[in-house]
Amino acid sequence: MKTLVICSGGLDSVSLAHITSQKYQLTRLVSFDYGQRHRKELDFARAAATRLGVPFHLIDMRSIGGALSGSALTDDIDVPDGHYAEDTMRITVVPNRNAIMLAIGFGVAAAQGDEAVATAVHGGDHFIYPDCRPGFTRAFETMQRAALDGYADVRLHTPFVEQSKADIVRAGAAHNTPFAETWSCYKGGDIHCGRCGTCVERREAFHLAEVADPTVYADPDYWSAAIAGREAE
């Protein structure tokens, strides 16, 4: 299956790229610059494409991202600290982001003769991000089949949609994903902050997967307090 992978440069999508390269025919990685404050993630996506020997397509969505206002990822709004499932994390939603990116991905796949678009949405995303849930991915694939009817047959591949981030860590480790060469932190500093929702989720995933975490965090211990606080609610 000739598969295009939507790759942010994060742990999930880079793991998916490595898994896809071994299980299917990885054709290309597609990334998006939508004006995110953690734009450095794109360097990790580019490095993954180089490592895996496939073309890297960087789509400039900055003008679109500028119109999708109100998110801590694109506006001058502080990224909150805490557990990834807390309501405060809703400020990190970029409206319709995945739908827009997937639509472009399907267009690229159709133009290039690919058979599938793979995205690393997973169970941990369901709390906050509606365009990561199974209902959305099923509906989106139906829409795309109608949009490309008679022109191209491209499927949506979402192997992690019902899995946890810990499951992704285990699968990534089994396929030799270099986790140190991935970026998750939404704050986009020199190193992972260890306090934002994505850092907490990343640290917890390695712990639950019982896989060594090579990540350097500015606050390496905060995650456990965030998890404990959530469980106490």
UniProtKB/Swiss-Prot annotation:
What catalytic activity is recorded?
A: 7-carboxy-7-deazaguanine + NH4(+) + ATP = 7-cyano-7-deazaguanine + ADP + phosphate + H2O + H(+)
Identify the keywords attached in UniProt to this record, alphabetized: ATP-binding, Ligase, Metal-binding, Nucleotide-binding, Queuosine biosynthesis, Zinc
Q: Where does Zn(2+) bind?
A: 185, 193, 196, 199
Give the enzyme class. Answer: ligase
Q: Which organism is it from?
A: Ruegeria sp. (strain TM1040) (Silicibacter sp.)
- Give a yes or no for keyword Ligase in this entry: yes
Q: Which protein, by its recorded name, is this? A: 7-cyano-7-deazaguanine synthase
- The residues that cross the membrane are none
